[in-house]
Structure formats: C-alpha cells, structure tokens
C-alpha cells in the first residue's frame, strides 16, 4: 500500500487515504509547518530582491534618487518654497499646507456621529443601514398639500 509523504512536515502518513490526509492537514503541527515554510520562502524572496537591487545600484544601473544628499564638493540647489523647509534669507516662510496630522480613530465614533462609509470589501457594522443604490430618486406616497402660512394667524384655507 502506498504511503503519503508530507513535504511540509517531512514525514510519511500511515497510508494514503483522503481521510488520513484531511486529518493530517487540519492538524496544528502541519499548519505551523506550512506557515513556517511560506514565511521562510517570503524572507528568501525579499532578501533576493534586496541583493539584486543592491547589485544593480552598485553597477550604476539604478540612478540615485533625486532628493538624495548631493555629492561632496557640489553646490546644493535649494528646494522650491512649495516643498517646505526652513525659510531662506530675504524670503517669507511658506504657509503651512495643512493642520496637524489626523490620529486614526480608535473604537466607535462619538454618539450622534455615524461613519461616512466602509472600505472596499468591508461589511457594514451590525445594525447599520446599507447605502442607497445609485438611480432615480424614489417617489413619495401622495399626501394632502401642506397649508402655507404667510403670517401667524393668517392661514390659507385648503381648497
């Protein structure tokens, strides 16, 4: 009878049947071994990419970044005022572009505030209403016309 070999666990199962494989693959040790295998594989891929990028940069195939430090002995061109930085002599300081950075909201919003929307692929919270679908506005059911008042006590009678 053939045996089933698990590459992740480096072991043979007692026999090759779907129930034995299913039981093995749902086990804690097997899942940990699979996770470790792919984690090591990702680390190797990242290191390989870093090594290739470093080698290409050292060979001059990748130009230095435009805002890197200038080579020694060359004059540095000041950045335009729109990029910020300290004001230069004789120049007005640039106005701040925006307020302080927003802190991510932790927990539920304050009472009375509803979240604006949901991220792509996210479900709305329990009890929340689904957003309206785009399309023509819905018709209201017919009602009696409202009475308009021009001044207090002066009501137009309903016709």
UniProtKB/Swiss-Prot annotation:
Annotated stretches, region: Disordered: 63-95, 139-159
SMART domains in the record, alphabetically?
A: ZnF_U1
One Pfam entry for this protein is zf-U1
Key word Transferase present in the record?
no
Matrin-type Zn finger ranges: 4-36
Q: Which GO terms describe its molecular function?
A: mRNA binding; pre-mRNA 5'-splice site binding; U1 snRNA binding; zinc ion binding
Quote the subcellular location field of this record. Answer: Nucleus
SUPFAM superfamilies attached to this UniProt entry? beta-beta-alpha zinc fingers
Would the keyword Zinc be found if you checked this record's keyword annotation?
Answer: yes
Task: Report keywords, A-Z.
Answer: Metal-binding, Nucleus, Ribonucleoprotein, RNA-binding, Zinc, Zinc-finger
Q: Where is the composition biased (Pro residues)?
A: 77-95
Q: Kindly list the biological process annotations in GO that this record carries.
A: mRNA 5'-splice site recognition; spliceosomal snRNP assembly
Q: Show the GO cellular component annotation of the record.
A: commitment complex; U1 snRNP; U2-type prespliceosome
What does the UniProt function comment say about this protein? Component of the spliceosomal U1 snRNP, which is essential for recognition of the pre-mRNA 5' splice-site and the subsequent assembly of the spliceosome. SNRPC/U1-C is directly involved in initial 5' splice-site recognition for both constitutive and regulated alternative splicing. The interaction with the 5' splice-site seems to precede base-pairing between the pre-mRNA and the U1 snRNA. Stimulates commitment or early (E) complex formation by stabilizing the base pairing of the 5' end of the U1 snRNA and the 5' splice-site region.
* Subunit composition and interactions: Component of the U1 snRNP. The U1 snRNP is composed of the U1 snRNA and the 7 core Sm proteins snrpb, snrpd1, snrpd2, snrpd3, snrpe, snrpf and snrpg that assemble in a heptameric protein ring on the Sm site of the small nuclear RNA to form the core snRNP, and at least 3 U1 snRNP-specific proteins snrnp70/U1-70K, snrpa/U1-A and snrpc/U1-C. snrpc/U1-C interacts with U1 snRNA and the 5' splice-site region of the pre-mRNA.
Q: What is the protein named?
A: U1 small nuclear ribonucleoprotein C
Q: Which organism is it from?
A: Xenopus laevis (African clawed frog)
Its gene name is snrpc
């Amino acid at each position: 009878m053939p045996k089933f070999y698990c590459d992740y666990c480096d072991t043979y199962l007692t026999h090759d049947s779907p129930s034995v494989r299913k039981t093995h693959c749902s086990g804690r040790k097997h899942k940990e071994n699979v996770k470790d295998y792919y984690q090591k594989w990702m680390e190797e891929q990242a290191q390989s990419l870093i090594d290739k990028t470093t080698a290409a940069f050292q060979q001059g195939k990748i130009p230095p970044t435009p805002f890197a430090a200038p080579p020694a002995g060359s004059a540095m061109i000041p950045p335009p005022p729109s990029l910020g930085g300290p004001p230069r002599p004789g120049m007005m300081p640039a106005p701040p572009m925006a307020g302080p950075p927003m802190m991510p909201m932790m927990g539920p919003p304050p009472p009375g505030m509803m979240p604006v929307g949901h991220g792509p692929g996210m479900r709305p919270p329990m009890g929340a209403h689904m957003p309206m679908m785009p399309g023509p506005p819905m018709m209201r059911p017919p009602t009696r016309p409202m009475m308009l008042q021009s001044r207090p006590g002066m009501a137009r009678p309903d016709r």
